[in-house]
Curated annotation (Swiss-Prot):
It comes from Mesorhizobium japonicum (strain LMG 29417 / CECT 9101 / MAFF 303099) (Mesorhizobium loti (strain MAFF 303099)). ATP binds at residues 46-53. It is found in: Cell inner membrane. The keyword Nucleotide-binding applies. Keywords: ATP-binding, Cell inner membrane, Cell membrane, Membrane, Nucleotide-binding, Translocase, Transport. This is Spermidine/putrescine import ATP-binding protein PotA. The keyword Disulfide bond does not apply. GO terms for molecular function: ABC-type putrescine transporter activity; ATP binding; ATP hydrolysis activity. Part of the ABC transporter complex PotABCD involved in spermidine/putrescine import. Responsible for energy coupling to the transport system. InterPro entries: AAA+_ATPase, ABC_SmlMolc_Importer, ABC_transporter-like_ATP-bd, ABC_transporter-like_CS, Mo/tungstate-bd_C_term_dom, NA-bd_OB-fold, P-loop_NTPase, PotA-like. It holds the Pfam family ABC_tran. Residues 10-244 form the ABC transporter domain. The lineage of its organism: Bacteria, Pseudomonadati, Pseudomonadota, Alphaproteobacteria, Hyphomicrobiales. Belongs to the ABC transporter superfamily. Spermidine/putrescine importer (TC 3.A.1.11.1) family.
Length: 364
């Protein structure tokens, strides 16, 4: 698989989807445009009702856009029914046939396409090896675990060698440990097959773990597209910063913007250097975000000062919640060691040091 895909598998161009009529109209998608590259793992991420599943259904052909185009390698597929699109879908429910064996489930789609029996047998064997289920080929799907059923559903969807595989929150029914294992498995399958995966989820951890790029959606719009690092460390809008991980929001006076950076004077009077979000328009005041792990507590003077209000232990790290002298709230995430305690107590007066390149100015 190439490291840097050089062409688009899917292009969504100014797509809108309206449900209802008259005063009851609801815009599930509002002039959405996005390009998804060949061979990449692309995730549509957002809360319930943001439009991510609607967009996936339009790409699959289960519904049709009210306006706009959906291109597959340059061909407009928006008017085509699902069976005429080289696209397969894995659903949350898996939709396996319980009376069939694992092998028969995997080969079902190939049979419907009228493939020769010898080709089906060879392809099923290849898929069983890919998902590491050769030993369970003759077992009925009702007799295997949830994680194994997930692998069968993936193998069945991959068997016809679609150009694009759509995955509609397929891990949501699994327990935490199995879900983590399947995240690694999905990424492995995508890498080994080289097929473009489009994954829908509301789970930020899933998106950050598996994706080459992520599109964050809200209210029928795509707010930001970027790598997991871009989305987490360089959020463009408040919704993105707030939805992905834990974030501190600070009000600052802005000056000297240029070359993607600016000076932000916080309410404490301290001026720090911050990066600016793409599309930021220079203005007097703006919102600055700092991730909790990018700040450090000190018992001396810092860029900010305040009082420790609460300390929450999470095993791998501790979250220390501080009420700033400015009235704003701030959380510092401190990685734990085997020594007892985090070094601070409730009521302590503390300073907060903001690391270099730790602050980002939002565009909204």
């Amino acid at each position: 698989m190439p490291d840097k895909p050089d062409r688009n598998a899917i292009e969504v161009v100014n797509v809108s989807k309206i449900f209802g009529s008259g005063e009851g109209q609801v815009a599930a998608l509002d002039k959405v445009s996005v390009s998804i590259r060949e061979n990449e793992f692309f995730t549509l991420l957002g809360p319930s009702g943001c439009g991510k599943t609607t967009l996936l259904r339009l790409i699959a052909g289960f519904d049709f856009p009210t306006a706009g185009e959906i291109l597959l390698y340059g061909q407009d597929i928006a008017p085509l029914p699902p069976f005429k699109r080289p696209v397969n879908t894995v659903f949350q429910s898996y939709a396996l046939f319980p009376h069939m064996t694992v092998a028969d489930n995997i080969g079902f789609g190939l049979e419907m396409l009228g493939k020769p029996k010898a080709e089906i047998k060879a392809r099923v064997a290849e898929m069983l090896k890919l998902v590491k289920m050769e030993a369970l080929a003759g077992r009925r799907t009702a007799q295997i675990s949830g994680g194994q059923q997930q692998r069968v559903a993936l193998a069945r969807a991959l068997a016809p060698q679609p150009k694009v595989l759509l995955l509609d929150e397929p891990l949501s029914a699994l327990d935490y440990k199995l879900r983590k294992e399947m995240q690694i498995e999905l990424k492995r399958l995508q890498h080994e097959t080289g097929i473009t995966f489009i994954f829908v989820t509301h789970d930020q951890e899933e998106a950050l773990t598996m994706s080459d790029r992520i599109a964050v959606m809200s209210s029928g719009k795509i707010l930001q597209v970027g790598s997991p690092w871009d989305i987490y460390d360089k959020p463009a809008e408040r919704f993105v910063a707030d939805f992905i991980g834990e974030t501190n929001f600070l009000t600052a006076a802005i000056s000297g913007t240029g070359n993607g950076k600016t000076r932000a004077t916080l309410k404490s009077g301290t001026t720090i250097e911050a990066t600016v979000a793409e599309g930021f328009q220079p203005k007097d005041n703006a919102t600055v975000v700092v991730r909790p792990e990018h700040a450090k507590l000190t018992k001396d003077k810092g860029d900010l000062s305040g009082t420790v209000e609460n300390i929450v232990y999470f095993g791998t790290d501790t979250h220390i919640h501080v009420q700033l002298d400015s009235g704003e709230a701030f959380t510092v995430r401190q990685q734990n060691t085997r020594s007892a305690g985090c070094g601070f107590d409730r009521g302590d007066k503390v300073g907060i040091l903001i690391g270099n390149d730790a602050a980002q100015v939002l565009r909204d």
